[in-house]
Amino acid sequence: MNNWKKLAAAVILAGAVVMIQGCGGNGEEAKSMEKGRVWKAATEAAYPPFRYVDENSNLVGFEVDLLKEIGRRTGATIEFRDMPFDRLLDAVAGKQVDMAIGAITVTKEREKLVAFSDSYYRLSGYSLLVKKGNPPVRNEEELAGKVVAAKRGSTSEARAKAQNPKEIISMDHYEDIFKALEAGKADVGITGDQAALYELEHGGSSRLSLSGTIPTEDNFAIALSKDN
């Protein structure tokens, strides 16, 4: 039984006392086994509101709080390691870290490389953003023939590539998607709905417009080594 998967599922879905299954022991026994342990968690610290660095140089956000709560309930310490998004799964598979969290969508292709916890968040859609005043891009089909800015290695990038765009500009950081739009380097940017909303609510609405959405039911989960 995958201990990490049991752990994540217990916190995320049940909201009950976290239990790590171990040698048939009960939750308290399993918790005592993890007390004092340091778990290395890979993430890309630039995707608000899920995770980002605040004005005090602290890593914060929903996913950060989630892992800290898992650590609190088990007596373990979470040690975050910042790295590019497209390296997260390789870091887990190569056992450089114990887990990765970072709005990682569960896909069949990714399941060949790593295991996943139960989902902790369901994405309702991808947002299509354009520079304020530019023609709207309303849906997935209208990406055809457009220059699209997307996050490197993301499922949103894969969705955009499937629509025969003129060009995909792959960005290492989500904020670079917004900068590319503002600079006129891309016709449209694609990102998760909550990330787009956060940008628009924190000053982006003066420069960018939400012009369309792509419905989806992608699930985010914690990536874990298949050997755990």
Regions of interest found by a model, annotated:
Residues W39-T43, E140-G153:
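Short loop->beta-strand "edge-of-pocket" segments that line small-molecule binding or catalytic clefts
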Residues V64, E79-V92, P135, T155, ...:
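Short helix-initiation/N-cap motifs at beta->coil->alpha
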Residues D90, I104-L113, R159-A162, E182, ...:
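A ligand-binding cleft/hinge motif common to bilobed small-molecule-binding domains
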